[in-house]
Amino acid sequence: YNGHLNMAYYNVLFDRAVDEVYELIGIGADYLKRAKHSTFTAEVHVRYVRELHANDPVRVTFQLLDFDSKRFHYFEQLFHATEGWVSATSENMTLHVDMAAKKVASFPDSVMRSLARMKAAHAQLPRPEAAGRRIAMPGR
């Protein structure tokens, strides 16, 4: 309503973009079925920078900031696809989970190699200015 994109749908767009990345690094839908492992989001920080309206074209970028054997930290930006401005950002910490045991588990070697290649490529990009921000009331 109000002619703009509701805040929940920003997260849907970010999540759909991550699904594409998961396929690239080998932890997509087939991986869940085959390996019985998945990912759970442990923390997310979304910033709503500029309003999108219904039917605005969008594009999402993904930047891997860091990873270890059981988790990865990434930053996404949602852009108006034709005008180029940033509408929202999303910073996430994601855990790799053994679905049978329901506990955090190590990535397989193939995924670790994919993450290492991606991090090396993304390390060439500038770190997003908004990465690592926190919510707080300014001191008075």
Explain the meaning of each model-derived region:
Residues 1-41, 98-140:
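Hot-dog-fold acyl-thioester-processing enzymes
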Residues 2, 6, 58-60, 94:
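Short beta-strand segments
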Residues 21-72, 87:
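Hydrophobic beta-strand-centered segment that forms part of the acyl-chain substrate-binding groove
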